[in-house]
Amino acid sequence: MDSAQSGDAQAPNVPAATEEPTGEATTKRRWRRNRIACDSCHSRRVRCDRAFPCSRCLRSDIRCEFTRERRKRGRIARSRLVETKTAVEKASQPVETRDSAPAPAEAGSGPVPNGSPSSTFHHRSPATNDVTGSAPSIDERRSQADVSLPPRKPGHTVNATEEWLAGTHVSPGSYEPLAGIGPGEGPFPRIFDIWNGVDLAGYSDPASQGSKITGLGQTPAPSATILKYPVLQPVMPYLESSLPRKLVYDLLDLYFTSAFSTHMHPVCHHIHCYVLRKASFLSREAPRPSSPALLASMLWVAALDDRAFALPISPPQRKKICQFLCALTLRLLRPLIHVSFKEQEGAAASDPLHAAVGQDGPPTTVHHPFEVGGDDRGLVGPAGSLDDVITYIHVASIISSSEQKAASMRWWHAAFTLARELKLNQEIEVMPSEENHPEGSSPSFDYSLAGWSGVDTGPFFDYSNPARPSLNCVCDRGHELRGAITEEHREERRRTWWLLYIMDRHLALCYNRPLALLDAESEDLLLPLDEGSWQSGNIHSNSPKPDGPQCPLSGEKNKRRVFPNFICHDHSIFGFFLPLMTITGELIDLNQARNHPMLGARLNGKDPWDAHVGEVLRQLELYKASLTTFAATASDPDAPLSSAFPPKPDQQPVEPSLAQAYSWHTQTVISYASYLVHVLHILLVGKWDPVSLIEDKDFWTSSPAFASTISHALDAADSVDHILRYDPDISFMPYFFGIQLLQGSFLLLLIVERLQKEAGEGILNACEVMIRATESCVVTLNTEYQRNFRQVMRSAVAQARGRPVNHSEIRHRRKAVLALYRWTRKGTGLAL
């Protein structure tokens, strides 16, 4: 029997909570358990002060109430059992045989056809404790079964929250205790141990056999009070009993916090760009319907960021919060693991996390039923949704920034595969048909949030050409239209695909692997909007191609960019970094062909090879010219600010502080872009592998190509000096910059290694700049390869400046460190 329930039926001989008159001034007060605790304290298993509203509910902004049935000790009387059985049998009768009329809420909802059941948010009736399914995301509306979870009694655990918080220095105005997350409690894995080469989704802590956390073992009901951000409603049943609402709100605010006041740029290091609109997520009237797994992963990403230390929580609390959100995210994603559902059901008894939820499972386990995407033998997993792809990106980004980089590829491959299954590389059809419907790419029945409905079969289908559904812009539609596929949803799909496109080229450069997402399958998709138009909601699908989406309202205005594009036009990752990654993809193809065991020997030095190299050089020159134009255009902050925000007739001149912030952002982008151009020049004609570069068995250092790369290496160091001026902590794009900094430093290391004391001061100063940048990267995103390379570079510079060392020993150690990261035919790059 749990402590809260035993408190309800407390014997009357418990000592009173009053002071005994002993005559001493320091008499210790004796407490007795309250016989009645409010619902919130009862569910969180903490002491209630019995003053309604109690102090805990007041601090947490939770409605304090007592609605559960009072229980007494002993066995239930037989007459009571008979009455309960009769009530259950009556409730299980068909609707047609009941004499009573349906409730107003039931009468308002019409009959639901098979394959298109309605879905609602979690809610719990105080009398019945019935929990309904959560609101699925935009793409999860197909064939969802209505689920009713039986109430579950949480396992008995020893609550050490009071003692734990007593040891932490938390101010009285900070967050309320994290109930049920005491030291050594709960089924949550240690966040730094689960990367240890194991499958994260299959992780199960042995300590979870005897204890279950309320947030995962059952789906407690959110309080009746209105949420500050209604978008969080699907995930609140999992968080209500473990995290205070104020903390959840602050983490969501941190996720959408911008590093600049002029443009939206993520401040969290694990967020590379915004594929979701801030205004749509934080809206109180029509929030974007999102899956619980996506919401949990967003909170996890925010909690992992260093800026979470600014929140009034202690480091031990933050660590436990990250552990909780990690376990919750992976648990909610578990149905998307590519295993048989039959095997998963058979393993329910042995899996404590699965057993805690039960065979019916939370609503997220039935978003993708087998009847739609599986086969008759249970060998094909569910399709998934756009929200699941974004969740995979969050999880994979977190693992990639850890030491277990190779383990992240399974998550990236899952994101790539699911994105291809959902056909994110294709323009979504406004009116999908049975034959041309992309599997899992669009919703097909009602949404549960106001203003976001299912698919409309309205007058947007081109009946004159039934073989090709209409792709035209639907910017005249609003969220208030029932069944509307909005332009926002179409743009989310594009931005998700292009983010994966960037990540694929980045990972291929890091891990010396071929490309997974090809240019050929991306050429029909419009490039992302600029960040200002996207965040302001000014979205149009207006392609310059005649066979692409057309916008009847815009006409020849608002023409979108198409692939391929080698122009720098925006401050966002999609604006200046996507063209460079397109060129990087061609360099990766060239390097893979050069390292091919048979193809490389036949093509190296031939005319087709030289023609390909010349084409890449042309693209780089085109980008450099656009970068100069961008710098000149961006010198006037009035133009971009008017595009980032809706113009006003009486718009005032830009404030000096805002103009300075815009100029600072522009110079940061130009510095990074200039450095990346020089690195791509080095990768085009130079060697990627540091050991082969130092050994120089083919005498490449005597070729004209080596002389041309030296100037780019020095110019790259000069660009890094500018980067350190505008972005001292390398926080603008730390995830992408590490490998670029490494490849740009290999040539300088080679020169210092060869020349030793004869190296000029310019070379040594360039090396010092690279070392300072590497040290900043280590502070921002601490990874082992950067720490190792910093030591190698520092020892080489110190040796060149005259420090006495054992040359043979130091060279052997230096080569041993560099041999860990190879870009040869069999090398795996940074993936150890």
Curated annotation (Swiss-Prot):
Polar residues bias: start-end ranges: 126-135
Major localisation: nucleus
Gene Ontology CC terms, in alphabetical order: nucleus
Renumbered residue ranges of the record's region Disordered: 1-28, 84-157
DNA-binding region location: 38-64
Keywords assigned: DNA-binding, Metal-binding, Nucleus, Transcription, Transcription regulation, Zinc
GO terms assigned for molecular function: DNA binding; DNA-binding transcription factor activity, RNA polymerase II-specific; zinc ion binding
Protein's name in the database: Arabinanolytic transcriptional activator araR
Species this chain originates from: Aspergillus niger (strain ATCC MYA-4892 / CBS 513.88 / FGSC A1513)
